[in-house]
Curated annotation (Swiss-Prot):
Organism: Varanus flavescens
Membrane-related topology note: Multi-pass membrane protein
Swiss-Prot/TrEMBL catalytic activity: a ubiquinone + NADH + 5 H(+)(in) = a ubiquinol + NAD(+) + 4 H(+)(out)
UniProt protein name: NADH-ubiquinone oxidoreductase chain 1
EC nos: 7.1.1.2
InterPro entries in the cross-refs: NADH_UbQ_OxRdtase_su1/FPO, NADH_UbQ_OxRdtase_su1_CS
UniProt-annotated location(s): Mitochondrion inner membrane
Family stated for the protein in its record: Belongs to the complex I subunit 1 family.
GO CC terms, sorted: mitochondrial inner membrane
Segments traversing the membrane: 5-25, 72-92, 102-122, 146-166, 173-193, 225-245, 254-274, 295-315
Pfam families tied to this protein: NADHdh
An example molecular function term from Gene Ontology annotations: NADH dehydrogenase (ubiquinone) activity
Any Gene Ontology biological process: aerobic respiration
Length: 319
């Protein structure tokens, strides 16, 4: 029992530390892009800012408005963080916590479950702003999961299996980014929408919905939603890295880990750069982009990936 608990903690704590410093990186980057310093008081160069923010949020009194549903209100952020942590289990870094045969499929299934916590949070808040924000988030997440699923299917047809290790083996000689760059481009934009990041941050909608589905949250529960959002950003970028720009063969674990961290960091910084550079989309444009542009494109590319091995009599390797 004790080794299992320690093993899980050793997995969760580094993720939370990475999330904390990603928030600092975002504030620093936004600061420098707006010609200011960003956090620079707490600790050397402001490095202790995320720890101070965390302490402040978790020691604040959790205010619960009278009209809310208490059980769902508290369980939603806990469920959100649990699902965000569960997604990490099948990811090889270079060894996965649980080596699943259907690793990619399980990641897709767990990420779909995260929608429930957002919907519950909006409904339990009993506020019109929160429910509109949560409905937007659910519609957006479910819609973009369609393209993510089709892109994953196309990649799986190329690799010939559902395991994450097979992806690194397939990319020993060339990255899948070079052969499937339209899919990689659409995948990256879909991950932005899936994680509700700018320019697709319509769930927050500061000008109209105050803060979206988490408007009634304060203190600890709000911090849990905050951690969930940034953990999802990192895990999506990890997935992008493994799918399209392989970190290398797992036979060299140290090199694999350094490569994986570096590439994930570059992708995460591009998320922050996009937030600082682009204005928000209108909601109809967001849905138009998916249903009228991405969906036909991904489906046609999926058909192409399916027909190519058959037409050239080259059946993918069976694991």
């Amino acid at each position: 029992m004790l080794p299992t608990t320690i093993n899980s903690l050793m997995y969760i704590i580094p993720i939370l530390i990475a999330v904390a410093f990603l928030t600092l990186m975002e504030r620093k980057m936004l600061g420098y892009m707006q010609l200011r310093k960003g956090p620079n008081i707490t600790g050397p160069y402001g490095l202790l800012q995320p720890i101070a923010d965390g302490l402040k949020l978790f020691t604040k009194e959790p205010i619960r408005p009278l009209h809310t549903s208490p059980t769902l209100l508290i369980s939603s952020p806990i469920l959100a963080l649990t699902t965000a942590m569960l997604i990490w289990t099948p990811i090889p870094m270079p060894y996965a916590l649980t080596n699943l045969n259907l690793g990619l499929l399980s990641i897709l299934a767990i990420s779909s479950m995260a929608v429930n916590s957002i919907l519950w949070a909006g409904w339990a808040s009993n506020s019109k702003y929160a429910i509109i924000g949560s409905l937007r988030a659910v519609a957006q997440t479910i819609s973009y999961e369609v393209t993510l699923g089709i892109i994953l299917l196309s990649i799986l047809i190329l690799t010939g299996g559902f395991t994450m290790q097979l992806l690194t083996t397939t990319q020993e000689f060339t990255w899948l980014l070079t052969t499937s760059w339209p899919l990689a481009m659409m995948w990256f934009i879909s991950t932005l929408a899936e994680t509700n990041r700018a320019p697709f941050d319509l769930t927050e909608g500061e000008s109209e919905l105050v803060s979206g589905f988490n408007v009634e949250y304060a203190g600890g529960p709000f911090a849990l939603f905050f951690l969930t959002e940034y953990a999802n950003i990192i895990v999506m970028n990890l997935l992008t890295c493994i799918l399209f720009i392989s970190p290398g063969p797992p036979q060299h674990p140290e090199l694999f880990l350094i490569n994986l961290i570096t590439k994930t960091m570059i992708l995460s910084l591009s998320f922050l750069w996009i937030r600082a550079s682009y204005p928000s989309f209108r909601y109809d444009q967001l849905m138009h982009l998916l249903w009228k542009q991405f969906l036909p494109l991904t489906m046609s590319l999926c058909l192409l990936h399916t027909s190519l091995p058959i037409s050239t009599s080259g059946i993918p390797p069976l694991s």
